């Protein structure tokens, strides 16, 4: 079943075309890696997919329904941003309370388990957290949401190696038990190569590649490099 689909999706800012005629189809219960250099249009595309901004042209559908101004479709999506729209004075536990109110599949027990595993102080105010701990709040939101479509934009920003490894371990563990469509947008390409099943590559706002990782590698491409370099 198709979980998310775009047709001829474009977003223009004045004279700059950030996303250019992107047509993709994402299946249910698969993990996708969204790759590309800085400025390739990844974050803009994700914001459109999550209904955060409106495209200039084209369409986005989630399980066959238009995503824009559609609360039912929006509840199927959890979008974890680099900078979350969180009231800085809110306590961490209150952030998760709101998540519990919004996401139909929210698992509070699992969220509390993750809080312990990441050693996060749920009584602390969000603005008092380190950058890495703020990132972890987003990670817990994404994992515990159990949303049918879960999107992570640069999910390991500010995390040390141990916490990055823990995130991917928990992601795969939870995905195996509660399958869903997951999109990981990252510049740490080699770090996600063992996690993703399918690869989507944007180049200057246009779709360059969409295929399974296996087919992509069989055709002689290389997924490697520092700072979001994708070479072939």
Where are these regions (language model features)?
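ABC-family P-loop ATPase nucleotide-binding domains
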Residues: 81-137
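The feature captures the beta-strand-to-loop junction immediately N-terminal to the Walker
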Residues: 32-37
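Helix-to-loop junction immediately C-terminal to a conserved catalytic motif
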Residues: 50
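Helix N-cap at the start of a conserved alpha-helix in ABC-type nucleotide-binding domains
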Residues: 161-163
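Conserved ABC transporter NBD signature motif
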Residues: 26, 58-69, 73
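Catalytic Walker B motif of ABC-type/P-loop ATPase nucleotide-binding domains
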Residues: 150-154
């Amino acid at each position: 079943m198709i979980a998310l689909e775009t047709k001829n999706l474009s977003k223009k800012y004045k004279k700059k075309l950030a996303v250019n005629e992107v047509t993709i189809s994402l299946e249910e219960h698969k993990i996708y890696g969204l790759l590309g250099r800085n400025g390739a249009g990844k974050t803009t595309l994700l914001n459109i997919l999550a209904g955060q901004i409106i495209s200039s042209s084209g369409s986005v559908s989630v399980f066959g329904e238009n995503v824009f101004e559609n609360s039912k479709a929006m509840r199927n999506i959890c979008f974890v941003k680099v900078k979350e729209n969180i009231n800085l004075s809110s306590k961490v536990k209150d952030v998760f309370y709101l998540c519990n109110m919004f996401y139909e599949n929210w698992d509070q027990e699992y969220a509390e388990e993750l809080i312990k595993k990441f050693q996060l102080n749920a009584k602390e105010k969000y603005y008092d957290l380190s950058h890495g701990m703020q990132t972890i709040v987003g990670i817990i939101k994404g994992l515990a949401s159990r949303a049918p479509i879960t999107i992570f934009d640069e999910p390991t920003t500010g995390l040390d190696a141990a916490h990055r490894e823990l995130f991917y371990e928990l992601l795969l563990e939870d995905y195996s038990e509660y399958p869903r469509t997951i999109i990981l947008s990252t510049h740490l390409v080699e770090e996600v190569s063992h996690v993703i099943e399918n690869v989507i590559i944007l180049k200057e706002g246009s779709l360059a590649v969409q295929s399974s990782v296996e087919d992509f590698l069989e055709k002689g491409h290389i997924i490697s490099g520092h700072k979001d370099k994708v070479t072939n």
